């Protein structure tokens, strides 16, 4: 370190304390980065990487950004998953002898962004923590920008992962005893995981819970927030305890497959349920809407209360339209309050706050004109006239962004400020008069009096006017020479400059002091403002429900006591919106305690998946308290929705399409109850025909015999359609299609009974496969159909590439019964050598004796390899 400058020694010492951050090190008007930080930042920010001490043997990599525009650079880094430590100069270099003292004043992390441009107005920016003491788990999360703070607890990792998926945090804080396996699963939701080894001894306000583990989770979270922000955050609310079981459960797969808040293909909001339902007018309302979509209610009383309000708004179009106008004038009160508390609020923010609270009396008067019994839940608004008066009397209507350059306060707000401003104003009037007088005295009409921060006030004369001009004759003293002009000062101008600039400096300094006082005064209203923001956000959501109900002809759902689901002329709300409303084909659905499984057949592209999804989405909308796209809708209240839709490998976890399919199915079969909804689309297509058919039938039987969950099960295994003979709870339906002159016409209508044709080749023709392929497929299909024995297995058919499907007449038989219908030769071909006799083979015994519960995946793979080698 002997050859390192004192400044770099200071840098290295501070950097050693923040090794997981990029250090923004303040040097004058720049934030500089060095060494690996500089290399990383220059790459991400696409700025020039240079060198410090370039002529030395080991120059230091360096890059920098201007401090006045640093926010955009910080946002870019944070959005790419980095943490940024802001190191400021704590002393004025002009007044300090030796090294300027520097400190990290804040760490910006993905979960603690407070700047207005750094967070999406319509998205919460959550940071989450959890602690485990098996089998108990406690989870706490916070949006630092709004102050929201919640905590819960449960007893299984499945609920933990569901909650993390629902909350969708940008950062997760954990202690150091969390397994690597669980970390990898969390990484699928968020890339930023912070490990905190110890907890602070400081006790934060978690007075609403006595649960020790929940206290620890909340303390871990708040400890980290205060460690990174390094200041008082009075806007963070008292922690609210909630229970995950109070809401409908949907795991990551269900939310993805149903495209509730993000589309699968484009990874965007457009084309999702959130996109459809968002007729909100405020950022707070938009965030609340997403929360409601993520957490549908299971309390009938709470659902009906929301629906009653939607009823009221639906019945009063003029009042609703007026309310939307008022809400459109309301800014993001939650985040404005957050910035007040944090200390980075500016005068324009406070003007936005003023305009927002000025609408509260209008909204309250409007609600008072409607049904008070219905609106009691949302008519708790409290006009903040005292705060409104403070803001109205203090700030000018259009203040500058900076709070340190003056121009913030109205004349008359502060007597001392008025005196300074008057002195400055009079001085500028005097300057204008002096300029006119000097022009007349010198005869130079282009003479002007100007100002800059380096030289102060000066008289400027262009070089063309200096040829016959003698400055000393007029008392001018040369101040600065330019290429095309000379600048002068006079004793009189210098004397007046001291008065003017003294007044301006004092005015600016006083204005900043007054603004800080105003900010602290506004901070006293934090709790009241947050309560108003919560009510306004709920109002905004409910008027949005009424707006889409009227716009798209939705109806109020009702809820059955006997767990019946009956949808009359139901539609998929998103698909309907993106296509012509009049072209959409509505469909019915009825599931009850006797018939709770629909087995759905029909050709590809006919609308099977859309039909199943719309039942799930309608159920979610109903339990949010919204109207639904149906002519009539009677629903049970579902506790959970499970889906198995589409085909996608999980490359991150190394899982194949079929493994993902089985994992999704496993969750449904394990956790579904009679109050659940299951959507299974084409189960078994990721494996061979026999395996897929066997698994599909076994799953249907399991649901029928065990959970009795309402189930929509689409399939191309036509052999399954005979299951209705053995399972009274199963009903066959199909999505109709007609073939006309060799062309396939999709009717998109769900009808009773099974379909008798998959129309696979016709669909391939629609996809414009080469004609040669289509023709060859038709020939092969004809050969299959001609050689198929109606009373035996299709294993006698000549197969091309893939195995054909089992004949429909044998589809109601078990795998064992099916093999009985084969010839001996066919049976030998279809059977495994392991099971050719009744004696247990050595390999079977080895498999039977494996202790799977104590084997790691790697050990299991090694053992499987050994068994495979024995068979070779």
UniProtKB/Swiss-Prot annotation:
Keyword entries, A-Z: ATP-binding, DNA damage, DNA repair, DNA-binding, Nucleotide-binding
A Pfam family it matches: MutS_IV
MF annotations from Gene Ontology: ATP binding; ATP-dependent DNA damage sensor activity; damaged DNA binding; mismatched DNA binding
Gene3D superfamilies, per database record: 1.10.1420.10, DNA repair protein MutS, domain I, MutS, connector domain, P-loop containing nucleotide triphosphate hydrolases
Record-listed ATP binding positions: 602-609
Family designation: Belongs to the DNA mismatch repair MutS family.
The protein, known as: DNA mismatch repair protein MutS
Source organism per UniProt: Staphylococcus aureus (strain bovine RF122 / ET3-1)
Gene designation per UniProt: mutS
């Amino acid at each position: 370190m002997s050859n390192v400058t004192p400044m770099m020694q200071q840098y290295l010492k501070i950097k050693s304390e923040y090794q997981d951050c990029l250090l923004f090190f303040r040097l004058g008007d720049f934030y500089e980065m060095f060494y690996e930080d500089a290399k990383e930042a220059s790459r991400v920010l696409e700025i020039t990487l240079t060198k410090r001490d370039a002529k030395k043997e080991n120059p230091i990599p360096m890059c920098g950004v201007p401090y006045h525009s640093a926010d955009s650079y910080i946002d870019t880094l944070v959005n790419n998953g980095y943490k940024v430590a802001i190191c400021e100069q704590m002393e004025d270099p002009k007044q300090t002898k030796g090294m300027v003292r520097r400190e990290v004043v804040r760490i910006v992390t993905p979960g603690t962004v407070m700047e207005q441009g750094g967070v999406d107005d319509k998205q919460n920016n959550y940071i989450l923590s959890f602690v485990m003491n098996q089998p108990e788990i406690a989870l706490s999360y916070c949006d630092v920008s709004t102050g929201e703070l919640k905590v819960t607890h449960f007893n299984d990792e499945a609920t933990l992962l569901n909650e993390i998926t629902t909350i969708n945090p940008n950062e997760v804080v954990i202690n150091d005893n969390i397994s690597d396996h669980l970390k990898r699963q969390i990484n699928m939701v968020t890339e930023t995981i912070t490990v905190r080894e110890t907890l602070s001894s400081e006790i934060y306000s978690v007075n609403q819970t006595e649960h020790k583990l929940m206290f620890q989770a909340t303390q871990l979270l708040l400890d980290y927030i205060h460690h990174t922000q390094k200041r008082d955050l009075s806007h963070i609310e008292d922690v609210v305890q909630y229970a995950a079981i109070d809401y409908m459960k949907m795991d990551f797969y269900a939310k993805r497959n149903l495209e509730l808040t993000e589309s699968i293909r484009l990874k965007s909001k457009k084309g999702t349920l959130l996109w459809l339902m968002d007729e909100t007018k405020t950022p707070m309302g938009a965030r609340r809407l997403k929360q409601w979509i993520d957490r549908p209610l299971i309390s009938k009383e709470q659902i009906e209360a929301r629906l009653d309000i939607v009823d009221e708004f639906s019945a009063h179009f003029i009042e609703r339209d007026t309310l939307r106008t008022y809400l459109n004038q309301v800014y993001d009160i939650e985040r404005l309050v957050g910035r007040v508390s944090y200390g980075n609020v500016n005068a324009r923010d406070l003007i936005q706050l003023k305009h927002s609270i000025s609408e509260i009396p209008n909204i309250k008067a409007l609600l008072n004109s409607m049904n008070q019994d219905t609106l009691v839940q949302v008519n708790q608004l409290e006009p903040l006239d005292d705060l409104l008066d403070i803001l109205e009397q203090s700030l000018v209507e259009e203040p500058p962004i900076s709070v340190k350059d003056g121009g913030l306060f109205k004349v008359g707000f502060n007597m001392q400020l008025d005196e300074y401003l008057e002195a400055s104003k009079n001085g500028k009037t005097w300057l204008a008069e002096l300029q006119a007088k000097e022009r007349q005295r010198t005869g130079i009409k282009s003479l002007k009096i100007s100002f800059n921060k380096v030289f102060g006030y000066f008289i400027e004369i262009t070089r063309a006017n200096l040829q016959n001009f003698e400055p000393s004759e007029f008392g001018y003293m040369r101040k600065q020479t330019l290429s095309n002009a000379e600048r002068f000062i006079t004793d009189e101008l210098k004397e007046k400059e001291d008065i003017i600039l003294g007044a301006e400096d004092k005015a600016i300094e006083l204005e900043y002091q007054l603004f800080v006082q105003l900010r602290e005064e506004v901070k006293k209203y934090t709790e009241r403002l947050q309560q108003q923001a919560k009510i306004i956000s709920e109002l905004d959501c409910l008027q949005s429900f009424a707006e889409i109900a009227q716009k798209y002809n939705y109806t109020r759902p009702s809820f059955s006591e006997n767990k019946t689901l009956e949808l009359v002329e139901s539609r998929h709300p998103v698909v309907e919106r993106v296509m012509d409303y009049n072209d959409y084909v509505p469909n019915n659905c009825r599931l009850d305690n006797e018939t709770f499984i629909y087995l759905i057949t029909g050709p590809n592209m006919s609308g099977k998946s859309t039909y199943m999804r719309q039942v799930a989405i309608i159920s979610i909308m109903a339990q949010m308290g919204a109207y639904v796209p149906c002519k009539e809708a009677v629903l049970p209240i579902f506790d959970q929705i499970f889906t198995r839709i589409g085909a996608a490998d999980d490359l991150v976890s190394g899982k194949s399409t079929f493994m993902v399919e089985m994992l999704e199915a496993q969750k449904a079969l394990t956790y579904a109850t009679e109050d659940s909804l299951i959507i299974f689309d084409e189960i078994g297509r990721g494996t061979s025909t026999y395996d897929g058919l066997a698994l599909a039938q076994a799953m249907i039987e399991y649901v029928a015999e065990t959970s009795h969950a309402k189930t929509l099960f689409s399939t191309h295994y036509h052999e399954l359609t005979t299951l209705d003979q053995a399972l009274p709870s199963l009903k066959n339906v199909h999505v109709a299609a007609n073939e006309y002159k060799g062309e396939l016409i999709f009717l998109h209508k769900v009808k009773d009974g099974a379909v008798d044709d998959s129309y696979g080749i016709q669909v391939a023709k629609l996809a414009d496969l080469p004609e040669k392929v289509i023709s060859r497929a038709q020939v092969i299909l004809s050969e299959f159909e001609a050689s198929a024995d109606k009373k035996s297995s299709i294993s006698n058919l000549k197969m091309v590439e893939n195995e054909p499907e089992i004949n429909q007449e044998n589809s109601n038989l078990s795998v064992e019964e099916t093999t009985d219908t084969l010839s001996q030769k066919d049976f030998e071909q279809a059977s495994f050598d392991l099971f050719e006799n009744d004696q247990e083979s050595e390999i079977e015994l080895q498999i039977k004796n494996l202790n799977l519960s104590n084997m790691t995946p790697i050990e299991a793979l090694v053992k499987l390899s050994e068994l495979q080698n024995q068979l070779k």
